[in-house]
Amino acid sequence: MEDSMDMDMSPLRPQNYLFGCELKADKDYHFKVDNDENEHQLSLRTVSLGAGAKDELHIVEAEAMNYEGSPIKVTLATLKMSVQPTVSLGGFEITPPVVLRLKCGSGPVHISGQHLVAVEEDAESEDEDEEDVKLLGMSGKRSAPGGGNKVPQKKVKLDEDDDEDDEDDEDDEDDDDDDFDEEETEEKVPVKKSVRDTPAKNAQKSNQNGKDLKPSTPRSKGQESFKKQEKTPKTPKGPSSVEDIKAKMQASIEKGGSLPKVEAKFINYVKNCFRMTDQEAIQDLWQWRKSL
């Protein structure tokens, strides 16, 4: 009894096979199943007239068993070449045995669908699948700690690369300001150390010689570079020419920008943005602005 119960409760795995047949006036189709161990279903999809069918009425009929086990006949489709050459049944399922026939018309009529078979799965294959799933789960848990550490490292590396790129861009834009700040910090550090270390020595020398001696501080690289900067100051950029300013304003307008419409605001705009101080050139630019 227990073995029979186990066989009844075993899961079923469906398999699908293509089905098709041709009906004519003198040609029926009998769908039978010799293997009774598995469940079979015939799922009909479409019924259509074949090439060469006459423009006449075709009636397709199916004969099978009803719930009580008695034979029953059902009309599946009514076709005519000029009106309705094909009909979709949308999955009309019938349990075999089934007889498909052409009740009216000469044909040919083609019927297509699927043959569904429910196959029992082996218990051994299920056990093997479960063992494979368990092994995969164990390997995934073991590899989880190592895999979790790799992601943050990659993120940190990416963040460091992004920070380095940003710092490189800022260094390229503000190179002069950074050099000046570094030189000031380098200049302050040795001065403090020398002031702390040399007061006693300077006091002794001043007492011996009777003269006030200035504390000797070693020259730092920052002082030398700072003096070089004082000797060679950068030449300020001069004002742009009138034609260059017009070209830049025109480009700004083409990009969607706007210029001041009031003369006083326009003059301030030219002086601040283009460092233009020539009044004649400013008036020339204002006349050009009004002509736009």
From Swiss-Prot:
Glycyl lysine isopeptide (Lys-Gly) (interchain with G-Cter in SUMO2), cross-linked positions: K27, K32, K141, K150, K214, K246, K248, K255, K261, K265, K271
Covalent cross-link (Glycyl lysine isopeptide (Lys-Gly) (interchain with G-Cter in SUMO)), residues: K228, K261
Organism: Rattus norvegicus (Rat)
The protein's name in its UniProt record: Nucleophosmin
Residue positions where Phosphothreonine is found in the record: T75, T95, T198, T217, T232, T235, T277
InterPro entries tied to this protein: NPM1_C, Nucleoplasmin, Nucleoplasmin_core_dom, Nucleoplasmin_core_dom_sf
Post-translational modification remark: Acetylated at C-terminal lysine residues, thereby increasing affinity to histones. ADP-ribosylated.
Gene Ontology CC terms: centrosome; cytoplasm; cytosol; granular component; large ribosomal subunit; nuclear matrix; nuclear speck; nucleolus
Gene symbol of the encoding locus: Npm1
GO MF annotation, one: molecular adaptor activity
Primary localization: nucleus
Compositional bias segments (type: Basic and acidic residues): 187-199, 221-233
Annotated region described as Required for nucleolar localization, given as residue ranges: 241-292
Glycyl lysine isopeptide (Lys-Gly) (interchain with G-Cter in SUMO1), cross-linked positions: K32, K246, K255, K265
